[in-house]
């Protein structure tokens, strides 16, 4: 399974083509749009999300509510394009018109793709870089992940996410599955412990008032994953390696870990390895889950726990020092409309990116042309965990 996105932040639309979804999977566009709506929420978002009403139009690959097995094309319209039609349109415009609209960017933002992207593609107007490097593209990735979540639900695989930390204020590292699920989306910072939600909001407000931004840590959990998905044989088939690549490909994500993650470096092996147990109902299972459901690059049947680190957004309303690429003079960096904190929304993006990586790995492990075939293979693998 693979996908390709296209579109710019202030262009007319985002388009995504997904190839490899099995036939006969029931798809309701409202289920996808429900996930799209979640991405737009969260405390700390900027004015852009007040303009956009992200909904998906499916234009190929689904007929009368069921997938055909052919490529699925989805479109997300950018409502803000109305204000950018001339500057972002395909038709040529004069340099005078461009200057009059004050949309040319020559002062790159530290921490963004602006300067290096301009060098790489020889763009003297850095808007050509930031329009594509913008996190607006993640709307298309959430649409892909939403499709994958529908597939995973048919296989009795649950995936959900939360915020663990914002600006140094932390929720508990781990919760039991029941507590986690019962408290999803109960507040606008997406933490389980309501008592720290206001402290996080205050931290976000403080950053906004200072013209600054803050980052944090998100967590994604995948439950009821069959054993043995991934491989120990080759580096590029390891499931944790694939998930890690997907997570750090999200805008502003700078780190990823599994289970206890970097804390594993502080403990002896006897406190980190998960002991193997067996009973006739569950088959093999682990007495703990310090490793986050992954051993030797493969799923071991325990919940897969993924932690992603998001740096503060690089666009600041109190901009840092930069250099004008035309005059080489010192200037403050360009200011673009942005969020002061996008960690709650990023947890949704991360959830859907992980959903894609999980679905892709499953479809490689259990090659199937239609959903019924895939379901049967999953049943057989789960039975193997009991009978082996």
Swiss-Prot record:
GO terms for biological process: amino acid biosynthetic process; aromatic amino acid family biosynthetic process; chorismate biosynthetic process. One of its GO terms (cellular component) is cytosol. GO terms for molecular function: chorismate synthase activity; FMN binding. It catalyses: 5-O-(1-carboxyvinyl)-3-phosphoshikimate = chorismate + phosphate. Keywords: Amino-acid biosynthesis, Aromatic amino acid biosynthesis, FAD, Flavoprotein, FMN, Lyase, NADP. NADP(+) binds at residues 39, 45. FMN binds at residues 132-134, 251-252, 296, 311-315, 337. Reduced FMN (FMNH(2)). InterPro entries: Chorismate_synth, Chorismate_synth_AroC_sf, Chorismate_synthase_CS. It is an enzyme of class 4 (lyase). Pathway: Metabolic intermediate biosynthesis; chorismate biosynthesis; chorismate from D-erythrose 4-phosphate and phosphoenolpyruvate: step 7/7. Its cofactor is FMNH2. This reaction introduces a second double bond into the aromatic ring system. Belongs to the chorismate synthase family. This is Chorismate synthase. It comes from Staphylococcus aureus (strain MSSA476). The lineage of its organism: Bacteria, Bacillati, Bacillota, Bacilli, Bacillales.
């Amino acid at each position: 399974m693979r996908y390709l996105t296209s579109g710019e932040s202030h262009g007319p639309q985002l388009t995504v083509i997904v190839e490899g979804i099995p036939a006969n999977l029931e798809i309701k566009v409202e289920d996808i749009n429900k996930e799209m709506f979640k991405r737009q929420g969260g405390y700390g978002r900027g004015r852009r999300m007040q303009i956009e009403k992200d909904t998906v139009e499916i234009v190929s690959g689904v007929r009368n509510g069921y997938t055909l097995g052919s490529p699925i094309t989805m479109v997300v319209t950018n409502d803000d394009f109305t204000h950018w039609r001339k500057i972002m349109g395909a038709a040529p415009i004069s340099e005078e018109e461009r200057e009059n609209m004050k949309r040319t960017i020559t002062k790159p933002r530290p921490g963004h793709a602006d300067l290096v992207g301009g060098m790489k593609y020889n763009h003297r107007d850095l808007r050509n870089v930031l329009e594509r490097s913008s996190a607006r593209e993640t709307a298309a990735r959430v649409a892909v992940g939403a499709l994958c979540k529908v597939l995973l639900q048919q296989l009795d695989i649950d995936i959900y996410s939360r915020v663990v930390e914002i600006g140094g204020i932390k929720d508990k590292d781990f919760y039991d599955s029941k507590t986690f699920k019962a408290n999803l989306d109960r507040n606008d910072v997406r933490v389980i412990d309501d008592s720290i939600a206001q402290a996080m909001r205050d931290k976000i407000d403080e950053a906004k008032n200072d013209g600054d931004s803050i980052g944090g840590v998100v967590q994604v959990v995948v439950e009821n994953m069959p054993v043995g998905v991934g491989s120990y044989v080759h580096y590029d088939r390891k499931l944790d390696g694939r998930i890690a690549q997907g997570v750090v490909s999200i805008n502003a994500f700078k780190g990823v870990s599994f289970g206890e993650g970097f804390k594993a470096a502080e403990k002896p092996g006897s406190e980190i390895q998960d002991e193997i147990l067996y009973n006739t109902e569950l088959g093999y299972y682990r007495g703990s889950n310090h490793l986050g459901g992954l051993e030797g690059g493969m799923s071991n049947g325990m919940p897969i726990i993924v932690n992603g680190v998001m740096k503060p957004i690089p666009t600041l309303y109190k901009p840092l020092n930069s250099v004008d690429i035309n005059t080489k003079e010192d200037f403050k960096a360009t200011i673009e409309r942005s969020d002061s904190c996008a960690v709650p929304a990023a947890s949704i993006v991360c959830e859907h990116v992980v959903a894609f990586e999980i679905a892709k790995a499953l479809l490689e492990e259990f090659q199937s042309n239609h959903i019924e075939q895939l379901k049967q293979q999953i049943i057989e693998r789960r039975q193997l965990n009991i009978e082996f």
